[in-house]
Amino acid sequence: MTPKDVLQIIKEKEVRYVDLRFADTRGKEQHVTVPASTIDEAAFEEGKMFDGSSIAGWKGINESDMILMPDASTAVMDPFFDDPTLILRCDIVEPATMQGYERDPRSIAKRAEAYMKSTGIADTALFGPENEFFIFDDVRWGANMSGSFYKVDSEEAGWNSEKVYEDGNIGHRPGVKGGYFPVPPVDSFQDLRSAMCNTLEDMGMVVEVHHHEVATAGQCEIGVRCNTLVKKADEVLLLKYAVQNVAHAYGKTATFMPKPLVGDNGNGMHVHQSLAKDGKNLFSGDLYGGLSETALHYIGGIIKHAKALNAFCNASTNSYKRLVPGFEAPVMLAYSARNRSASIRIPYVMNPKARRIEVRFPDSTANPYLAFAAMLMAGLDGIQNKIHPGDAMDKDLYDLPPEEEKAIPQVCYSFDQALEALDKDREFLTRGGVFTDDMIDAYLDLKGQEVTRLRMSTHPVEFDMYYSL
């Protein structure tokens, strides 16, 4: 789609406003809305000025002017606003150089794709994330000097089987780890998920599947067709936006938080990925799991740099409450065909053109631009340096003898450990100027503040363990 096409859409659909969107460092969508009458072809060359100092982890107030540069290919109508509004995703551009801002996540993702092409290894990287989420009826939390708490509720939750309702208790509910995946009325979110899928398709995505997930209390998943790196990261933001707003319209609240419930499965973002060149899938071969040597080396790079990748792929303190044994979360850095206890799975496919790997440890607190770019850079490092991942692990990794378990590397056990790993293992990310040391340092500082805030906060469980000592 070209700027002329966008202007034609504005005319045909009688668009009143254009919503300029971008992702901050944390991956949260930000937006500023302008009248459609202010958008012309020059807007796609000159952009729109804005104050970058208000975005956490970006510029100081003394050098705050930045440019939102709309990408015409991302134009899509917003399905939620009252007035006809067109969404345009933007890159963040430095006014002095008119180049992508080095801390802009989308610009980093673009540089990763460009670097991949410059190596000659591949011309296409495909990503297919599976974003899991919960749908709750009520959520409350507080954290201040007088105390801290959180409370979630869902009419579907197993803990409500004994609750007295004015109109009677519906009775049909998935229990703990019982949501995957009985038909309605046990699955009470069929119609809501379908409404979400309808919205996603109206916004240009190709929905492949939707279903209830394992956990009680409304855990769900919507599968969307894979896409190239930057386009798929764009789609992840649109998917989260659509899911949360459709839930809101139904009087519900949706969250992609990795571990909102204690004692049941958390929300992951398993990321399927593959490389191609001249239309040929480079991951398809005749080695283990139908993989090529290139794919095995890509896996080797992911495993080698996994702890640094955790900083981008599991980008919250809450992420590491999910990455524990016993809840289908992959903590072992191993690969296997069809074995979901390994952190990297090779899905079974009939068509070699669909051959891919699935990296299972990420979650949706990741900024998709940064996470996908970082995984691509790790995989390329594995290919360039012929890093073999070792033998596949086809046994149940959740039930290993202690001596075998110790021999297998694991993902980080905390966010601060992941940030330390990123600080020490960053060279593979800075090749080709994809990530810069300045960006990584700013990310470490921003995320370190989250670690410090939680570390300094008294937790209710501490009262349970220590109050009476």
UniProtKB/Swiss-Prot annotation:
Keywords: ATP-binding, Cytoplasm, Ligase, Magnesium, Metal-binding, Nucleotide-binding, Phosphoprotein
Domain of life where this protein originates: Bacteria
Domain GS catalytic: 105-469
Xref: SMART domains: Gln-synt_C
Stretches assigned to coiled coil: none
Keyword Cell division: no
Localization annotation: Cytoplasm
Any one Gene Ontology cellular component term annotated for this protein: cytoplasm
Obligatory cofactor(s): Mg(2+)
List of residues that carry O-AMP-tyrosine: Y398
NCBIfam families cross-referenced by the UniProt entry: GlnA, PRK09469.1
Function: Catalyzes the ATP-dependent biosynthesis of glutamine from glutamate and ammonia.
Protein name in the entry: Glutamine synthetase
The species this protein was found in: Methylococcus capsulatus (strain ATCC 33009 / NCIMB 11132 / Bath)
Source lineage: Bacteria, Pseudomonadati, Pseudomonadota, Gammaproteobacteria, Methylococcales
